[in-house]
Every structure is written in structure tokens, then in C-alpha cells.
Amino acid sequence: MSNVAAAGFCPFLSAAAPEMFGFDSFTELSKPRDLEKIFDSAEYVQWRSFRDTEDSRFVTLAMPRVLARLPYGQATKPVEAFNYEEVASTSDGRHTETAHDDYCWMNAAYALGTTLTNAFSEYGWCTAIRGAEGGGKVEGLPSHVFVSDDGDTDQKCPTEIGITDRREAELSKLGFLPLCHYKNTDYAVFFGAQTSQRPKKFDNPDATANAAISARLPYVMATSRIAHFLKVMARDKIGSFMEPGEAEAWLNRWISSYVNGSEGASAEAKAQYPLREARVEVKEVPGQPGVYNAVVMMRPWLQMEELTASLRLVANIPKAG
């Protein structure tokens, strides 16, 4: 599937099953102390090999599952044809606690798809898809409130389990894209944008940084769309008398319309013009007259990955006596 997605410059979005982690359900996600040790075992040799391939950047696995709808009932989701209560209720009509698997869950890739369509609808690009303020918020999730066994009012987590910041970073490092629910709200957020690819590390820091960028979904989406444009534009020029230099100038004029090099640009401007710098080089293929090879070099606007805080404490020691 990754080979097909790479050939078509069309990222493949899917979801990881809990069995991939050795769980029966994602509610067990908080139990392991170190997930990385699990994925270093011999059982995951093929997964690690897949992550090291070039085409794995076109695969994104979201997780965990998302609540698809509220349980049927007069107070939650009425059925017009007949009176149906999917969950048992107390004497005052409030729902009681029900089994986790009795809820209707759906693939988290659909939630990820809503962030992509929202970003494209607003900006014309699928780059603003992560962070609470950067387009990664999934709002309006089904919020089922019930009476727990101890008599307290509780909310069913619409993403199966609350994921901590530490576990979210751990999952992203392992090649997954977790959806994190904000407690006592009806929304969740995709903080990361990691594809399945494991970024390679080189001796050159610039090469390492470039590998990390190319493994991020927003940048894969942007470069894939530009690749689609280039293929269609080049097809329309077949049969023309265009020289390599003319083709290069023509393509550079076109791609410059998506570049915004202003350092003080707003977040909206960066979402509409996702490239900070770009250029195209066109060269003739040796031994094949009339066949040109176009190389596109792009520098996108970078999104904040992490903020590390340090504390400095100064204490005055009183003098004795």
C-alpha cells in the first residue's frame, strides 16, 4: 500500500489496532512503562524494516478509536421509529455505566480526515492540521455522561483513553499519530504529525533535519500536491518547442506564487503560502532528446515541535548570628 501511495503522491491514512501493541483494547495503553522496549523486540522486526523504507512516509496510522455516536435513547440519540434505550437507565432517566465494547467506535483516520478537509477548505492546503491552535483540534465529539457504579456523574472518554504528553511523544516517536482528548470537554487534538517513517540520522545536522521534516504529514501533503500540479502541467506541454531553460523559468514563476518569505507572516498567511523558499531546476536527460528532468527544492514553514522549559532558582542563605 505504501508503494501505491508513493507512486500516486497520495498519502494513505489508516489506523493502528490495539493488537499491534499486544493489547486487547486501547484502554490498556497506560499499563506499559516503556513502549519503545516492546517495539525493540524480535516480534516487530518487519515493522522496523517498514519504517526504514522511503515509501513509509506516505503511510500514517492514527489511534486510538473515536466514539462514533452516542448510545441510542430518548435523552441522547432518539430513534424515531420506536422507543429504544440502548443503555440501562436509573429511575430518574440517567444512563448507567456500560461496557466499553458496547459503545460504537470508529476508525481514528476519519477524525484525521476532518482536520485535512477543514484545512483545505480554509487555506487551500492541508498543512494546518496539528495542535490545538494550528488546525489539529477535532471538535464536537460525542459526549456520553452517565452515572458510575459509585454514584458519581462521569463522562465516557470519546477517544477510549486519555493519553498523557509523555505517552503521546513516545507514540509519535514509534511512528503513530495519537489523538489526545481534553478531559471534561467534547474535543480532542492531534498534536503530532508523524508518518510511519523513522527519520534517518546523519553526521550532517542539516541532513538529519531534512529527514525529520520529510517524515511529517503536513509537509508530505504539501509536496504531494505540488507534485500533482507539476505532472499535469508538464503533460500539457508535451509536443511544444520548450527548451530546458524556458521550462525552468516557467516552473519557477509558477511555484513562486506559493512562496511567502516574510519573517513576520501570520499563521494564516503561512497556512495559505506553505513554502518559505522554493526553486525548480530543469535539465535534459542524457541520451534522450526532448526528455527533461525537473528537480524541485522546497523549504516549508516549520511548525513548533516542542518547547523545553528550564528553571533557575536563586536562594539567599541567611548569615548565622
Task: For every predicted segment, state its role.
Residues M1, D203-P205, M242-N252, E263-E268, ...:
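Composition- and surface-driven signal marking solvent-exposed, interaction-prone regions
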Residues M1-Q155:
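Extended, regular secondary-structure scaffolds
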Residues E19-F23, Q197-P199, G287-P289, Q303-E305:
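Flexible loop/turn segments at secondary-structure boundaries
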Residues E86-A247, L302, E306-A309:
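Long, contiguous, structured domain-core segments that constitute the functional module of a protein
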Residues Y219-V282:
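Extended, compositionally biased non-globular segments
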Residues R279-G321:
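C-terminal edge-of-domain segments
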